[in-house]
Each structure stands twice: as structure tokens, then as C-alpha cells.
């Protein structure tokens, strides 16, 4: 990079990427953020559409104001395209803010702000297409309930007026709609981020390590349509039911079944989830082999981001269901409240762990359990109990 670009002095390199590099630059005593889009030959005719899309969006984004990044100007030098943006001082990204803040009310306020931003860009006929926490800047603002305001950035692959250049997405936040992009595509990804904001977990990720991902959102539609599998109807016991339900609805594979931003906003502000989002399909129970990961109340066993791993969910009739899951979220066995409460191991057993009921190893035959029964997860490899808990049906 040259020391001067179109009158901007390059101060430091911030990031180098496959498609663009970014720099802190200065002009007239003011600092700016410069993006240099490189290697246009790899895009051929797409590059011209990319530039046209960007130039269409710049005035639209400026008209939205402080909720989105400000693009000061764009220009070309030696065949390469550049954008100059406001340099946001004292900002962190949403990922880092979440890691340092577990206050639900403040996270809820940020979720409401995010919803307002999406309403604003959709109102300008823009689909963002690449939403993720790293694209959201967080700055202090005492006028907000959370004490911060958020600014949505990085509209490189956003779609104005339906003019798609490329289908893109980040692992864990990808697009499941293919070329059928619409505002509801952003709703799906927003649902993932809402789950992180309000439930403390990405529904498609066990840990943040790439190799530990359960499956990508791009495969989600296949899971639902071919395997009749759905997310746990209850994500987190601490979530208000309406918030839980609206998050799950955002992740519907079919666009038409996802809620509108107005419906999401209503729920975040205290209204019940709309009736039209129901009924949902009930997941089929499967019992694959593999290490058991039992959901246990009040522990952080086995997963970094869960407060509790023995999850009380509900079925389509709102009856309590306790599901035992392996590390890939496949259901191994189930405890259902009714006249009898049955607990069973899968017929093929577990690879390394067994379940004990009141000290006796369980077979695949369902056994009635009751409040006060002692459950142990026993490691056959280590010869010790991994975790112990007591059945409590509410």
C-alpha cells in the first residue's frame, strides 16, 4: 500500500483479507477507515455489479444516519475500488461485548436496537446478507438502557433492490435460502444472533472452535426436511417463553414461516409470540451411538456456553419433556411427564458413558422414574461418576 491514496495518508494497516484490505488513514487532521478492494479480475463482470451496488447503497445508508456505518466517499485508483468510512473511535465489536456482559436486560436492549437497525435498512430495500456479531460495533451511549449503542457495518455483499452479486455467509451464520434472498434471509441470521444475545449460545455451534461445529446453517434445511429434526422447542429455561418462541421461529427453514421484524420487536418489548407461528413439528427421537452428553441442571459440565445441560423443554402441547442429548444434539432418550415418567438408554448403548438410576445401571428398557430418584452419568472409561443429579419434574 502506498503512503498516500487519493489525498489520504495511510497511518496503519488494520486487516488484510482475501477480497479487501483495511487501513486507518488521515486527511485534514481527521482519521478515517479505508477499505481497499483488491483482485477485481477474479470477479470479472461481477466486479462492475459490485461497484454499482455499493454506489447505490451509499446514499441510502447515509439517509439512515447513526445506526449504520457512514461511508464518506468512494473512488477508484489504478483500477481498484476504495471506500472511505467514518473511523469509529472507542468501539468494540458485539462479540467482545457479549463476552464481557451477561446482563440480560442490557442484552435485550441491544437486541431491540439491532431490530430497529434491520427495519431501517430493509426500509431502504437493502438485504445485509452477512450479519454476524463481528459486523456490529458497540460504543458507549448513556442515553441507551444498555449504556451502549450499536452500529451495523460491512455492507460489502449487501443486496440493494434485489441485485445479488454473490451469495456469501460466514460459517455459523450462513444463508440457507440460496439465491432466493429476501428480507427473511436476514431474519434467519438475526435469529442466530438473538439466540447468542438472549440465550447465550449459537444454536449451530457447541464451541467457537471451527472443528467443533455441529453443522452449518446451510445444512439446516436438509436436516429439517429430510430428517424431520427441529431445534429444541425450549432453548433455555431462563428465557421468557415468548422470546424463546420468537427465536425458534426466526430459524424456520421456510421463509414464509419466519416472523416479521415488527413481530420480533413486539415480543422483545413484552408481547406474546404471534399465534400464526404455530403449530410446530415435533422432532423424531433418534438414538445414535457416541459419547453421551446429558443435560444437567445447575452445571456447566461439558460445554463452555451453557448454564445448564439437562434441559427442560416442552412438546407441541406444552407438556414438559426432558431430553438426553449427545454432543451433536441428537436425542438419545427422553423423560416425559404423564401418568408415568419413563427413562431409557438407547438399545445400542453409549460408547463410553452409562446411566445409573439409584445406583443401578440402566438397560434399554424404559424405566419409570419419580421425583427424588438419583441419576448418575457413569464413565466406563474412567470408572467414575461424571455427574450426579436428582430428578425433579416441575
Name the predicted role of every residue range:
Residues 21, 25-52:
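ATP-binding glycine-rich loop module of kinase domains
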Residues 70-81:
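Short beta-strand micro-motifs within the conserved protein kinase catalytic domain, predominantly
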Residues 110-111:
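Activation segment signature within eukaryotic-like protein kinase domains
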Residues 122-139:
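Catalytic-loop of the protein kinase fold
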Residues 164-178:
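Conserved activation segment of eukaryotic-like protein kinases, specifically the C-terminal portion
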Residues 186:
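Conserved catalytic-loop aspartate of Hanks-type protein kinases
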Residues 293-380:
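Forkhead-associated
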Amino acid at each position: 500500500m502506498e503512503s498516500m491514496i487519493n489525498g489520504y495518508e495511510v497511518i496503519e494497516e488494520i486487516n488484510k483479507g482475501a477480497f479487501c484490505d483495511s487501513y486507518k488513514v488521515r486527511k485534514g487532521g481527521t482519521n478515517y477507515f479505508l477499505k481497499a478492494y483488491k483482485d477485481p479480475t477474479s470477479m470479472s463482470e461481477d466486479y462492475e455489479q459490485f461497484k454499482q451496488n455499493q454506489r447505490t447503497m451509499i446514499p441510502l445508508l447515509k439517509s439512515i444516519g447513526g445506526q449504520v456505518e457512514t461511508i464518506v466517499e468512494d473512488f477508484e485508483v489504478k483500477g481498484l475500488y476504495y471506500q472511505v468510512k467514518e473511523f469509529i473511535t472507542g468501539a468494540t465489536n458485539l462479540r467482545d461485548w457479549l463476552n464481557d456482559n451477561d446482563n440480560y436486560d442490557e442484552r435485550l436492549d441491544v437486541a431491540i436496537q439491532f431490530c430497529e437497525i434491520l427495519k431501517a435498512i430493509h426500509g431502504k430495500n437493502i438485504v445485509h446478507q452477512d450479519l454476524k456479531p463481528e459486523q456490529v460495533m458497540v460504543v458507549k451511549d448513556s442515553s441507551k438502557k444498555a449504556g451502549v449503542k450499536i452500529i451495523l457495518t460491512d455492507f460489502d455483499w449487501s443486496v440493494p433492490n434485489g441485485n445479488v452479486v454473490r451469495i456469501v455467509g460466514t460459517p455459523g451464520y450462513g444463508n440457507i435460502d440460496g439465491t432466493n434472498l429476501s428480507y427473511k434471509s436476514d431474519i434467519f441470521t438475526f435469529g442466530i444472533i438473538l439466540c447468542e444475545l438472549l440465550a447465550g449460545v449459537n444454536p449451530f455451534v457447541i464451541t467457537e472452535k471451527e472443528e467443533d461445529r455441529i453443522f452449518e446453517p446451510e445444512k439446516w434445511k436438509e436436516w429439517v426436511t429430510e430428517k424431520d429434526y427441529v431445534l429444541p422447542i425450549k432453548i433455555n429455561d431462563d428465557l421468557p417463553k415468548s422470546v424463546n418462541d420468537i427465536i425458534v421461529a426466526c430459524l424456520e427453514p421456510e421463509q414464509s414461516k419466519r416472523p416479521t421484524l415488527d413481530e420480533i420487536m413486539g415480543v422483545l418489548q413484552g408481547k406474546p409470540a404471534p399465534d400464526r407461528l404455530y403449530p410446530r413439528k415435533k422432532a423424531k427421537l433418534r438414538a445414535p451411538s457416541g459419547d453421551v452428553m446429558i443435560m444437567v441442571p445447575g452445571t456447566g459440565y461439558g460445554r463452555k456456553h451453557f448454564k445448564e445441560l439437562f434441559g427442560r423443554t416442552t412438546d407441541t402441547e406444552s407438556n414438559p419433556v426432558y431430553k438426553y442429548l449427545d454432543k451433536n444434539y441428537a436425542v438419545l432418550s427422553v423423560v416425559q411427564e404423564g401418568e408415568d415418567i419413563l427413562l431409557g438408554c438407547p438399545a445400542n448403548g453409549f460408547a463410553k458413558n452409562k446411566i445409573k438410576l439409584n445406583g443401578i445401571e440402566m438397560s434399554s428398557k424404559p424405566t419409570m422414574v419419580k421425583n427424588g430418584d438419583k441419576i448418575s452419568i457413569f464413565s466406563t472409561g474412567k470408572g467414575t461418576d461424571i455427574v450426579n443429579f436428582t430428578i425433579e419434574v416441575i
